[in-house]
Amino acid sequence: MEVTLSQGEYRLLKLMAERGFREGTLEEASKILGVDKSSLASLSNLLAEKGVVEVEERVEEHYVLTERGRDALERGLPEEKLVLFLAGRGGEASVEEVRRALGEEAGIALGQAARKGLVVIAGGVVRLAVDQAEALKTITPLKKLLENVASGSKPTVGDELLREALSRGLIRREARRSIVLRLKVNPAEALARARVEAAVLTRDMLKSGEWRRLRFKPYNVKAEPPRVLPARRHFLAEFIERLRDILRELGFREVRGPLVELELFNFDVLFQAQDHPAREIHDSLWIKSPRRGDLSGYSDLVERVASVHERGWKYRWSPEVASRYILRSQTTAVSARILATRPNPPARFFTVGKVFRSDAVGPTRLPEFHQLDGIEGDEGYTFRDLLGRLDEIASMLGLKLKFKPAYFPFTEPSVEGYVKLPNGRWLELFGAGMFRPEVLEAVGVDYPVGAWGFGIERLAMAFYGVSDIRKLYTRNVDEVREMRVRWL
């Protein structure tokens, strides 16, 4: 029967014929033929498909020493140590002395020695029941078994000693897989009838004219090339970076702030009353230790904030409340810190970072998520300028935007921004407005400032067509690789 072989298959079959190989494991064949195991396995499977070679996978059970077994072989079995200890003490010792001498192994040693009739335990005293030589002779077979396992010898299955060694965790079973190659044809005859098929046309073939005598393997020019899967950033990180790029292009400078924040910047500077419900423990996450920070470095700011609160909210403002540490609940705290430095106009800043709320994990909410906050201010800056800027940002994201009047504690006038989804629904995305005079007075800024902020995950869910916010944090490599923007 004629068989078509590749050049690699032909060379392997020729090696088998020349070196007399008929049957053996993959490792043995690799040594005999001088072919690396990876290439040998690949070519053997191809020859098996053509009925030339049989490839058999064998699974054999082996026994190996555990760490406890190696320790017993090197330092002695627990019962062996007990026998030697008692022999050195005249044949007996108290149970307490044995425990001190053998430590954690005392219980195993006493149990095994008593079971094998090597010791007698009575009245808190342990005595040798046989002489030292007889006791060690009883223990020797088990040690011999461990030595055989260590050397690679296969113990007799069903042996009582084998069961004991397994139950005591001295040895363990291991399944070892091996591949056996077996020729199904006479290699010399197969070579004589073989038709060699070349896969590559080389320069030497053209030069020598050998190509005229060869049969070439046909190529499927419509076959798809192998899919290349290069590394990529997590899609949520890519989305956040896109938002950063847009704001940088518009002339905004990114700023950062601490995750553990003073209530002074998270609430008080923003004219949020100290008895506001958002400050309660069911909404904010307070720090246990240290509970409070030092406000001495913000004396001027504290004085202005106190004056604004006491005049506006009609209560006695407490620096103790303002000095409490919390996990920041809004990135507007970073904007407050920046404004407190009294930047010269025009001021254009944004921040992207994590905020924390006392929320349960669910399909639409997380206790930890990202917010983007932006501020822009200048002499003569107006609410209309703010809306125009927001519309510009939305258009750069490919979004259609509309506004509705709204209320926020630290901006007036204020709006909510809605973007149109592909299904025609409008999604509430952000809040925006002009900082109230009380906020600007507290930070010492004398020009108008507009502000906006939104949850990044909320927008990302719409962009990627994700209905469960937890999917944005998937670590499944396939999901990360396949995630694509569904909106644009």
Curated annotation (Swiss-Prot):
GO biological process, one term: phenylalanyl-tRNA aminoacylation
Cofactor(s) listed: Mg(2+)
Residue positions binding Mg(2+): 412
Gene Ontology CC terms: cytoplasm
Main location: cytoplasm
Binding site for L-phenylalanine: 332, 371-373, 410, 435
Top-level taxon of origin: Archaea
InterPro entries named among the record's database cross-references: aa-tRNA-synth_II (IPR006195), aa-tRNA-synth_II/BPL/LPL (IPR045864), Phe-tRNA-synth_IIc_asu (IPR004529), Phe_tRNA_ligase_alpha_bac/arc (IPR022917), Phenylalanyl-tRNA_Synthase (IPR002319), WH-like_DNA-bd_sf (IPR036388), WH_DNA-bd_sf (IPR036390)
Signal peptide interval: none
Cofactor binding note from Swiss-Prot or TrEMBL: Binds 2 magnesium ions per tetramer.
EC supergroup of this enzyme: ligase
Quaternary structure and partners: Tetramer of two alpha and two beta subunits.
NCBIfam families per UniProt: pheS, PRK04172.1
Family listed: Belongs to the class-II aminoacyl-tRNA synthetase family. Phe-tRNA synthetase alpha subunit type 2 subfamily.
UniProt-recorded name of the protein: Phenylalanine--tRNA ligase alpha subunit
Organism ancestry: Archaea, Thermoproteota, Thermoprotei, Desulfurococcales, Desulfurococcaceae
